[in-house]
Amino acid sequence: MSRDDKITRIASFMEILLLHLIKQAAEQRTTPSWERSIHNALRHLVRTNKRRKAGGYYLTDADLLAGLEEVFDDALYNASFEAWVGQYTAEALSRMIDRRVVIQRAFDLIQHTQQTTA
């Protein structure tokens, strides 16, 4: 798999992670299903980001943060269909949450997962 393919795949896992973190922040609750999705997205994201032979990671911390920023709006749009069974638009949902807090939470979870699976 090429580096670009890996980055695209990592971005997909970031979007899934953010989608569920946005729902948690907006609804102020979680479900076992959301927790499993978060866990699986983190596990697959970290596995895909890890370089096998050379060691290290494809994306640096700065790249991870930039990637989370980049996919946030798509995750917010998709979360608007799921949070409260789609009662709110993405714009309304964005007013219920703090974008920086959600992105920082996602980054912290990625960091923690990288450290515990190293």
Q: Which residue ranges define each predicted feature?
A:
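Surface/interface-facing alpha-helical segments and adjacent flexible terminal/loop regions used
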Residues: 1-15, 19-118
